[in-house]
């Protein structure tokens, strides 16, 4: 990250307008104009899903331990642990009612991370966590996220039996902040919503919506 434009920051105002970005980087000694985090990781995957785009059943687990030493280019040495788990249940065995569970945890194990590279909502692999909040709404040294999703078949044609469906979801996010004395689960932020899905590829199970 580089060329930050912190529009709400005004240290010359009376009183000064200090943002979380500025205060955090000042406290931990990070550059206010750019951030770098370079490292190596150890990864493991377990995947029994019958489809990656729209699974009817199966489980997925992912683990990544990342080490970010200064000698590789990181501003400060640190290490992080990223855990992901997904599970899918076909309630009636006809693919018309699916319940999906998704959870992940992103933890700072050692050292400190630049503000923009802290565990944050919406920065998962597909940028889908913490719907309907904007990306990066929640941020902290450690973060845990959980979501339940119900997928319902609505209409099908002879050409595409899974043409139209709906989805309802509910999620929770919690983050820690050492400098503000906030531990995990002190605050739990909730999100929920409904949506319509239109199937554009029966074979690949690709949906829009």
Give the residues covered by each predicted segment:
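C-terminal outer-membrane beta-barrel translocator/porin domains of Gram-negative envelope proteins
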Residues: 40, 51-158
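Extended hydrophobic-aromatic, low-complexity segments
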Residues: 141, 146, 156-163, 176-180, ...
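Composition- and surface-driven signal marking solvent-exposed, interaction-prone regions
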Residues: 76-79, 98-100, 160-165, 180-184, ...
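C-terminal beta-signal and terminal closure region of outer-membrane beta-barrel proteins
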Residues: 183-209
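Transmembrane beta-strand segments of outer-membrane beta-barrel domains in Gram-negative
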Residues: 1-93, 171-178
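Small/polar glycine-rich anion-binding or flexible loop at a beta-alpha turn
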Residues: 166-171, 187-191
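Short, contiguous acidic/charged loop-to-helix segments that flank catalytic cores in large enzymes
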Residues: 133-139, 179-186
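Membrane-embedded beta-strand positions of outer-membrane beta-barrel proteins
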Residues: 1, 42-44, 61-63, 101-103, ...
